[in-house]
């Protein structure tokens, strides 16, 4: 079975199977999602949403759909998956791509809880002071979409 490897979204992605052109499409899909949802890429759509803190902002359909899934997963897990924990991640030192981080012996900060995020259609309002981090959900959905690309 052929294997294709690349790094995206702070991790190594391994694609087993599919044609070479499909594997490249999978890589492009992951890179596109990273450009849209990364906290570490200036100008990403996620960063524009976070910078609008407290104000409504129009987002892409992909962003709105992904946020809707993240909010649903937060409800279904009683907040174990929390798309609003970006501020807590930053307070813990997660301020750049995981591959660039060094070990940090600081103790974990206080637990945070989900903050109410407004989503109506493609209009998002993140509460002032909250920072979205959709990374886990984005990776999961990217895998689902990648599987659909492979024959």
Language model region names:
Residues 1-135, 148-151:
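A contiguous, well-ordered beta/alpha segment that forms the leading edge of an enzyme domain
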Residues 139:
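Short, conserved phosphate/pyrophosphate- and ester-handling motifs at nucleotide-, phospho-/glycolipid
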């Amino acid at each position: 079975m052929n294997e294709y490897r690349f790094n995206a979204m702070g991790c190594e992605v391994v694609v087993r199977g599919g044609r070479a052109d499909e594997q490249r499409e999978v890589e492009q899909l992951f890179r596109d999602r990273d450009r849209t949802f990364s906290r570490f890429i200036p100008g990403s759509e996620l960063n524009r949403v976070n910078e609008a803190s407290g104000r409504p902002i129009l987002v892409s359909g992909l962003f709105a759909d992904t946020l809707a899934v993240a909010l649903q997963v937060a409800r279904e897990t009683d907040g174990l998956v929390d798309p609003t924990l970006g501020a807590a991640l930053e307070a813990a030192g997660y301020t750049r791509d995981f591959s660039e981080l060094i070990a940090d012996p600081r103790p974990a900060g206080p637990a945070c809880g989900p903050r109410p995020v407004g989503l109506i259609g493609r209009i998002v309002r993140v509460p002032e002071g909250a920072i979205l981090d959709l990374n886990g959900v984005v990776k999961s959905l990217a895998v689902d979409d990648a599987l659909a690309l492979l024959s």
